[in-house]
Amino acid sequence: MAGKGGKGLLAAKTTAAKAAADKDKDRKKAPVSRSSRAGIQFPVGRIHRQLKGRVSANGRVGATAAVYTAAILEYLTAEVLELAGNASKDLKVKRITPRHLQLAIRGDEELDTLIKGTIAGGGVIPHIHKSLINKTAKE
């Protein structure tokens, strides 16, 4: 009889463990955003919704298209902000203005070709033609 009692105790423990495991299965996991899964800051879900609204093929957009688009936008934003931050630091100012963005974008050849439009409040890039420079100032 002593042997049977031990088995019964073991069986009771396993059923309790199974019940606890079933209880864990019933619990819902916290939702994880697609942005955090991809390891980026830009909102993948919002970009996916925007892409679906703009496409003409019945709103069909692949799941990875939004992730790639968000990653590209995040990279370009970080690049522009880094250059604009350097421009504002050179001018000893703590706030980035449209002028700093203009100087950063026009100073980089690749960003200049990518962003050809006018930046409101950006001013103009300083440039003096060689023929206008005084000959005495050259020497």
Curated annotation (Swiss-Prot):
One of its GO terms (molecular function) is protein heterodimerization activity. The keyword Nucleus applies. Its main location: nucleus. It comes from the Eukaryota. Signal peptide: none annotated. Pfam families: Histone (PF00125), Histone_H2A_C (PF16211). Gene3D superfamilies: Histone, subunit A. Residues 1-40 are annotated as: Disordered. InterPro entries: Histone-fold, Histone_H2A, Histone_H2A/H2B/H3, Histone_H2A_C. SUPFAM superfamilies: Histone-fold. It is found in: Nucleus; Chromosome. Residues 9-19 have a biased composition (Low complexity). GO terms for biological process: heterochromatin formation. One of its GO terms (cellular component) is nucleosome. Residues 20-29 have a biased composition (Basic and acidic residues). Keywords: Chromosome, DNA-binding, Nucleosome core, Nucleus. The nucleosome is a histone octamer containing two molecules each of H2A, H2B, H3 and H4 assembled in one H3-H4 heterotetramer and two H2A-H2B heterodimers. The octamer wraps approximately 147 bp of DNA. Belongs to the histone H2A family. Variant histones H2A are synthesized throughout the cell cycle and are very different from classical S-phase regulated H2A. May replace conventional H2A in a subset of nucleosomes. Nucleosomes wrap and compact DNA into chromatin, limiting DNA accessibility to the cellular machineries which require DNA as a template. Histones thereby play a central role in transcription regulation, DNA repair, DNA replication and chromosomal stability. DNA accessibility is regulated via a complex set of post-translational modifications of histones, also called histone code, and nucleosome remodeling. This is Probable histone H2A variant 2.
